Amino acid sequence: MAALLSWMNLALYVLQLVVNGHSSRTIGPMSRRYETLITPAPYAFSIWGFIYTFLAATVIVDCFWSSLSFFTSAPNANVLRTLFAISCLMNMGWIVFFTNEYVNAATATLVILWFSLFALYAHIVTERRDTGFDIKRFVFSELGLTVYFAWTCAATLISFAVTAQYVAGDYLSLSSYVALLSVLSVGTLSAVIYEGDVAFGLVAIWALVGLAVKSTTLEARVELIAMNIRACATQSAAIVSAFIVIAITHKLLTPNRHFQPLQSGAPLYGDKPIGYGTTHA
């Protein structure tokens, strides 16, 4: 069953790449049509090349070198593989809905995608806590999914803004956009501080910097909101960067102590007498 799911995921992933490639010329214009004030500059979306490259490594490793796959060591490996299959289907579903202007359905699909990736990411960080960091497994199996999940966090919040703007028929208030950016910042800081996940933090910085340097030409009222949002994005990127430096420094400077716990201690009192020469205690 495990091998079947691994190959099914590879097939679904290839199909996902085909669907993305076929729709690549449509997604850009649709994104500009439903652009929000927290949508990063166009160059930021080039991160998909990185994501798809390392996700390819994830599914290929699971098929051919399963000992390096984070799926294999999981007690519920088949459930995790099924969740990855769901993520592929939701990715393709989002493309179909969004390119056909079903904005609300696209957002709902993205939420399901987020939950499936969150479950996979939660397993990765839990296993890393229990078994330690393995550089090979990280690069060839975990990295693609970590970056994918981090970017999906940003994309889901942007999609919420798209839906809200679509319903309102106008841009949102400054506080609404700042609230969405705050959710991204808090989630990222949690990953960096509690899990030491530098990769997650770097993806968030990429999205925030892409927003901070974005150039817009809007009416005066909206342009003022956009300027404030870019200032918030700049500040958030700086804060996340600072905590990444702190996390890395802490890792480098904290000695890795390994203690061997005592299996048993000498009894303080027992029924059996202890001989000390000719004297008994």
PLM regions: where:
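Non-transmembrane, juxtamembrane loop and terminal tail segments
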Residues: 256-281
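Alpha-helical transmembrane segments of multi-pass membrane proteins
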Residues: 13-28
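Central hydrophobic cores of alpha-helical transmembrane segments
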Residues: 200-211
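N-terminal membrane topogenic signal
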Residues: 1-10, 48, 202, 232
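Alpha-helical transmembrane segments in multipass membrane proteins, preferentially the mid-helix core
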Residues: 118-127, 152-166, 180-195
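Membrane-interface transmembrane-helix boundary segments in multi-pass integral membrane proteins
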Residues: 39-44, 170-187, 193, 212-245
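Membrane-interface helix caps and helix-loop-helix hairpins in membrane proteins
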Residues: 94-108, 166-171, 192-195
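Short aromatic-rich membrane-water interface segments that cap or initiate transmembrane helices
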Residues: 34-47, 138-145
